[in-house]
Structure formats: structure tokens, C-alpha cells
Swiss-Prot record:
It comes from Bacillus cereus (strain ATCC 14579 / DSM 31 / CCUG 7414 / JCM 2152 / NBRC 15305 / NCIMB 9373 / NCTC 2599 / NRRL B-3711). Belongs to the metallo-dependent hydrolases superfamily. Adenine deaminase family. Keywords: Hydrolase. It holds the Pfam family Adenine_deam_C. The keyword Transport does not apply. InterPro entries: Adenine_deam, Adenine_deam_C, Amidohydro-rel, Metal-dep_hydrolase_composite, Metal_Hydrolase. Its EC number is 3.5.4.2. It comes from the Bacteria. This is Putative adenine deaminase BC_3012. GO terms for molecular function: adenine deaminase activity. It catalyses: adenine + H2O + H(+) = hypoxanthine + NH4(+). GO terms for biological process: adenine catabolic process. Transmembrane segments: none annotated.
């Protein structure tokens, strides 16, 4: 039988490459890197063992006592006194939280996270499918291993939600070889209450032997059981040890989260250990798309450290960052262990208790060597893939800033909101700094509609903030002074996207977001400093929480209680009703 292998090569390695790998063992070809005398974590034996690890291009071709015959093109690294573990995996990345997928990966690789399973929502919203898929192929060229999920909903109420999330699009995404799961199921109430189209997508995901990720904050045991019956495999929303335990008891794999708005890992692990959990192979770690400054000291490494400090056995802590995840996603043949045939994603540690690697291999290339970053380069040419600055060909003027609706949003913490009725006069150009109410506007990306309301609990002394970074890709303005809001908006427009704070008609601080108005192209170190400065300035002006970028992102997020601003208007999540519809801008300038 002859297979048609023309066109795109769907195999991980070609026949020719596989023959070369075998030739290394025959002594006919030189190994490229030899990790000699390595004390490595054997994920199958669950113990530390000693071996020589042979690497050819991007693959581990042998692990054992033998040494290669041919060393002509080989770099020999003596690992005596060091510990070698598999590269860490982030199973639930949202790689557009001001950074972009490449800058996030470059930064995280310095701390040992070399594989990412990424949300597709931003690509789904902003690019045509063919463009998005070309970009997915482009990501294969970077040292990090990049995989994706396929969303079934937009986690907000959209004017065109049903046409955007249609079966043809979803099925094409699910069938893509780099897509490992469907979800996360932010619209689970629709699924539970009879949305058969979504249930069919879940069924199709399972038929393709891919995973379905939940999103079930605060769900009862019964709800969890029902959603398990409908096909969910894993959930990352447990906030306590008991919630994680309940998920485990209902047959879920449980992703334990530590993020910038839910830094719960320490509590979850402490409580799981108190509940008597001794078996950790159905648990793994995620940072669930945190904002840049949260990653200052790394990513998965921080969670491994926390687990070890809480008393989780060391080998389990490393498995929860690698082997458990690879096995769950059916990619254990290429990821998650130091063994023959795996992709050479390898961390070299100075001690078992310190998961920050001294050296990191990603696809067999050194991205960190003896503490030095050896991979600064950026490879993705975004403009080639229609990922360009935001072009806003419309303006707003004072006469568009009419606030007649007294119902608004009261911000209770970083992201939870409730409806409130403003008691103050908001029919003016400037609000007093004696209270924490501000003007709030959401304006369509194309300038066609706006929602004008009041927001309480965001800031006391903020002149104006404008952001093209938002949950729907629309523009958000917040502030006490309409003039400052306009100044900030005009600067966002000049930048081609960004987050801008203005005061006294001048720009006080800006984060340029030239990739779709959502992502920066700065290296993570620089972006972290810009974000920290923004947080500091907002806190000085009365922002009482710690993650303003998440607050802004989630103003439209209808998977969270209780009231949200969306393209269909001010929206009551509990009753699924529009409280105030959007209005058209007075005129298009």
C-alpha cells in the first residue's frame, strides 16, 4: 500500500530524519549534544537515575549507560553534580495579556517552561482562519513548543457571536494538528441548559481524541458531575483544596492555579495535603494567563517551588509540571520525560529543590547556558500575518460623552462587579475626587456604537485612561475628566493601540500595543517595568486592587458575576438581560 505523502508533512519527523536518528546509534553519525553523567528524573521509575543523554537536532535519541562512538560534531557537557529534569509545560496559557505568544515564551524559557498550550481566542476574534493557521505554522519555527486550544464561545455577549462561533470554523480548528483541546467552557450554562450545537462540538472534540477544558468557578458537586457527563475532562477553577478534591472525586483531572488574580496554589496544596491526598498524578499546574509583572521571577518554576515548600514530594512536584500534563494530553511520546524519542526540552538544575534551571534546552537548542540567556532573538514577523497596529479611522468628541444612564458597574475586587445606581450628577465635564465614581465608555473598535455608564470602585483621582486592550477588542475609556479621557484616547489612536493614562490634558504614562491594539512587541523585562509603573500610578490615584489590566480586560467578561459592559450593552449576567443598550456615536468624523 502506498501512502500519499505529498504536500504538507504531517509527521513529527520525516522518514529521512528518523533514519538519521538511528544512524547516530549505529555510530555512523555524530550526536550533537551529549549530557554526560547526568543525574536525571526518570518519570517512569519515579526516581533519580544516572545516565548519558544523547541529543541529535531536536530529539533525545538515547538515554542510558553507553557513550556515542562518534563525537566529531558533538558538544560534551559534564552534568556531574547537576540534576536534569524535563522542560516544564504551561497547559493553560492566554498569551496575549499585553505580551505576545513569542515574548511570553522567550521569557518563560529562561525559567524552564518550554512548552505552552495556548488560548486561540484573540487569533479567532481578529484573524481569518487561513491567516491564523499560517501563524500557528510559523510558531513551529521558534524554540518553544506551541500548542493551542479551540474556544467554543467568546466569554462575552457579542453582536455577531453566533456567526463568529459557527460549526464550520470550530470543526476546522479542532481538526488542526496543533490544537489539543476544546474550551475553556466559559459558556457552560448554555451547554448545560440545552445548547446542542455546543454539545456537538464537545462530542467532536472527544471523537478526535482531544481534551475538553472546563471553566467552572464555584460549581457545586452536582453541576460538576453533570458537566463531566457532558464530556469535560479537566477544570482549573478550584480556589480551595476542597474544591480541587471535589473535582478529583468527580473524575476530573485538576489543574491547580496560581495567577495574578487568583494566587491560590499555596492554600490549595495545604488543604489537599490536610485532606490526606498522597497521589498527585491527576494534578498539574497553571498560571492561567497572568499579567507581565506576575512573571518577573518566572512561571512554572514558582509553582514547583511552592509545592516543594508545602510538602509535596519533590518528584511529584516536577511531574505536575511536565509528565502529568504530557500524559493527560496524549503527547507523552514527545513531551514530559527524559527518555529516548522525546523532544529535547531539558532543564539542568543546580539542586533538586531549586527549579530555576542554570541551563535550558528547547528543541535541542540552548536558550539558556550557565545562567546566561542565549536566545534573545524574535522570529515572528507579525505584519506578514495581518497582525498590525490598530487603525482607528474615527474620533470622538465631547458631544459623544453623554452620560444619562444612572445604572452602572460597582467594582468589588480585581474582577467581580455588581450593578449600582449612581446618586451623583454625572451630566457634567468633570467629577469630584471626593468619591470613587468615574465616567466609563466602551466604544466599538470600528466606532459604530458606544455604551456610556458610570463605574464605582475603579479610581478616585484618575484624569483619564484609554485602552484598546479589552475583552472584546473594543475601546475602553475611564476617568473623572472628559478632556483627559479624550487626550488618552487620541494618544491610543496615534500609537495604533495601547493603554494610556492622561492627567491635566497631558499623557502621564503609556504602554504601546502595536499588535492589534492588544499586544506589545517589547521584550518581557521591559514590558514588566511599564506595567508596574501603570499599576503604581493607578494605585496612587485610588485604584484599590492589584491588577488593573485584568479589571479592564474583564469588564466585558460574562463568565463572571454580576454585571458587564458588552457590545450588546450593559448586561446583567444572572438574568441574561440587557440593562442599557448601546447607542450610535453622534457622527462619524
Amino acid at each position: 500500500m502506498e501512502l500519499n505523502t505529498m504536500g504538507k508533512n504531517h509527521y513529527k519527523w520525516s522518514n529521512k530524519q528518523l533514519r538519521e536518528h538511528v544512524e547516530v546509534l549505529d555510530g555512523k553519525r555524530s550526536t550533537h549534544i551529549l549530557l554526560k553523567n547526568a543525574t536525571y528524573l526518570n518519570s517512569y521509575m519515579r526516581e533519580w537515575m544516572t545516565a548519558n543523554i544523547w541529543i541529535y537536532n531536536d530529539r533525545i535519541v538515547y538515554v542510558g549507560e553507553q557513550l556515542p562512538e562518534q563525537l566529531t560534531e558533538c558538544e560534551v557537557v559534564d552534568c556531574e553534580g547537576k540534576y536534569v529534569v524535563p522542560g516544564y509545560i504551561e497547559p493553560h496559557a492566554h498569551p496575549y495579556q499585553l505580551y505576545n505568544p513569542e515574548t511570553l515564551a522567550n521569557h518563560a524559557m529562561q525559567f524552564g517552561t518550554t512548552t505552552f498550550i495556548n488560548d486561540n481566542l484573540t487569533l479567532f476574534f481578529t484573524l481569518k482562519r487561513e491567516e491564523a493557521f499560517r501563524l500557528l505554522d510559523e510558531f513551529n519555527k521558534i524554540p518553544a513548543s506551541m500548542y493551542w486550544w479551540c474556544r467554543f464561545d467568546g466569554q462575552t455577549e457579542l453582536q455577531n457571536g453566533e456567526s463568529l462561533f459557527n460549526s464550520e470554523e470550530i470543526i476546522e480548528w479542532l481538526q488542526h494538528e496543533a490544537v489539543l483541546q476544546g474550551g475553556e467552557l466559559t459558556a457552560w450554562p448554555k451547554l448545560l441548559h440545552g445548547d446542542d450545537e455546543m454539545l456537538t462540538w464537545v462530542q467532536e472534540t472527544k471523537r478526535l481524541q482531544k481534551k475538553v477544558e472546563g471553566h467552572f468557578p464555584g460549581a457545586s458537586e452536582t453541576t460538576l458531575a453533570k458537566l463531566k457527563l457532558l464530556g469535560t475532562d479537566c477544570d482549573h477553577e478550584a480556589m480551595t483544596g476542597q474544591e480541587a478534591f471535589t473535582r478529583l472525586m468527580q473524575g476530573y483531572t485538576v489543574s491547580l492555579r496560581n495567577s495574578s488574580i487568583r494566587p491560590d496554589l499555596e492554600v490549595i496544596l495545604k488543604e489537599l495535603l490536610e485532606l490526606g491526598v498522597k497521589q498527585f498524578d491527576r494534578f498539574f499546574f497553571t498560571t492561567d494567563g497572568s499579567h507581565p509583572s506576575f512573571y518577573e521571577n518566572g512561571m512554572t518554576n514558582v509553582m514547583i517551588s511552592t509545592a516543594i515548600k508545602q510538602g509535596v514530594p519533590v518528584i511529584d512536584a516536577y511531574d505536575m509540571a511536565s509528565y502529568n500534563i504530557a500524559r493527560y494530553y496524549n503527547m507523552e511520546h514527545v513531551h514530559g520525560s527524559i527518555a529516548t524519542g522525546r523532544i529535547a526540552n531539558i532543564n539542568i538544575l543546580e539542586s533538586k529543590e531549586n527549579p530555576v534551571p542554570i541551563s535550558v534546552l528547547a528543541k535541542g537548542k540552548w536558550v539558556k547556558r550557565d545562567g546566561v540567556n542565549t536566545h534573545e532573538a524574535l522570529h515572528i514577523d507579525w505584519s506578514k500575518h495581518k497582525v498590525t497596529p490598530l487603525s482607528l479611522d474615527w474620533s470622538i468628541e465631547k458631544e459623544d460623552m453623554i452620560f444619562s444612564n444612572k445604572t452602572g458597574i460597582h467594582l468589588l475586587n480585581n474582577v467581580i462587579t455588581k450593578p449600582y445606581t449612581s446618586e451623583i450628577n454625572i451630566d457634567c465635564d468633570e467629577l469630584s475626587t471626593d468619591h470613587d465614581e468615574c465616567f466609563f465608555m466602551m466604544i466599538a473598535r470600528d466606532g459604530s456604537w458606544q455604551v456610556n455608564i458610570a463605574v464605582k470602585g475603579f479610581a478616585k483621582e484618575l484624569g483619564g485612561l484609554a485602552s484598546s486592550y479589552s475583552g472584546t477588542g473594543d475601546i475602553i475609556l475611564i476617568g473623572k475628566r472628559k478632556e483627559d479621557m479624550l487626550t488618552a484616547f487620541r494618544r491610543v489612536k496615534e500609537l495604533g493601540g495601547g493603554m494610556v493614562i492622561a492627567e491635566k490634558n497631558e499623557v502621564l504614562h503609556e504602554i504601546a500595543l502595536p499588535l492589534l491594539g492588544i499586544m506589545s512587541n517589547l521584550k518581557m523585562r521591559e514590558l514588566i517595568q511599564e506595567e508596574k509603573q501603570m499599576v503604581k500610578l493607578l494605585q496612587e490615584r485610588g485604584y484599590a486592587h492589584d491588577d488593573p489590566a485584568f479589571t479592564i480586560l474583564f469588564f466585558s467578561a460574562t463568565h463572571l458575576p454580576f454585571i458587564r459592559v458588552t457590545p450588546i450593552g450593559l448586561y446583567d449576567v444572572k438574568s441574561s438581560k440587557v440593562v442599557a443598550p448601546p447607542v450610535n456615536l453622534i457622527k462619524q468624523y
